[in-house]
Amino acid sequence: MVGEGMLDAAVPGAVFASPTAGQILAATQAASGGAGVVHVVKNYTGDVLNFEIAAEFATDDGIIVSQILVDDDLATTSMTGDGPGRRGTAATVVVEKIVGAAAAAGADLERVSALGRRVAATSRSMAVALAAGAHPGAARPSFELPSDEVEFGVGIHGERGVGRRTFASADDLADQLIRPLVADLAIGRGDRVIAITNGLGATTGLELAVIHRRVTKILAAAGITVERALVGPYVTSLDMAGCSVTLTRADDELLTLWDAPVRTIALSW
């Protein structure tokens, strides 16, 4: 996701762990050109904490930092108490593309941040796994899943989901993924979306295409137009077998930014 029209820097932590505040600060300093730096942060406790610490240090160095929190995972909407709430998943790709295009076009820090927050607020995702992934070096998968069941609401760090259901056809699984997203976003006839059918690591392109075909049919039947789409392994959980679907409300402004030139390994047009 790093390149022309998208990110200036990315900060990977250890596998399934957040980057350290020191790593984030180093990336922030490297990306700073004097106009401020936008942090795009997936909503996980460690990530949020370390990015906030790094932002404080960056501010001390004279760098203006703005944060966009991505929290699109519908499966964790109902979490209460001291938990972080909805997790950040594949909608991060949409946020990064939009804010990257806006920054490349010369938008200031305030405008870029506002666009990113709008995209995050109007994006929802849901994932399903047919088999758990495994941490490198682990002797067994992160959770056990019988062959006649699927796990809904899995995360991108090997986390188990929020519920199990009977194994079903690709069309049935797509139905179960897409309908809660449509309901939560309150979209219907005449609305427009950007859709991502995302592989979790061990799902083939053909399987993802089958899911995406059904997603587009469901949306078309509801009068919802898929203006732009991505199909592929963009935000994975290493070797987990499964997929997620992301919907983002679209309008002319966002589509113009989406269509703006981008040159990264993941996206290029």
Stretches found by the model and what they are:
Residues 180-269:
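C-terminal non-catalytic interaction/assembly regions of soluble proteins
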Residues 105-210:
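Mixed-charge interfacial surface used for oligomerization/domain docking
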Residues 43-48, 95-109, 250-269:
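Extended, charge-rich low-complexity interaction segments
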Residues 3-34, 182:
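Glycine-rich oxoanion-binding loops at beta->alpha junctions
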Residues 48-62, 207-213:
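Short Gly/Thr/Asp-enriched flexible loops that form oxyanion-binding sites at enzyme active sites
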Residues 7-10, 36-45, 52-55, 66-70, ...:
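Short glycine-rich or small-residue beta-strand-to-loop segments that form or flank ligand, phosphate
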Residues 5-15, 59-88, 221-226:
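Short, acidic/small-residue loops that bind anionic groups at enzyme active sites
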Residues 70-111, 115-122:
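Short alpha-helices
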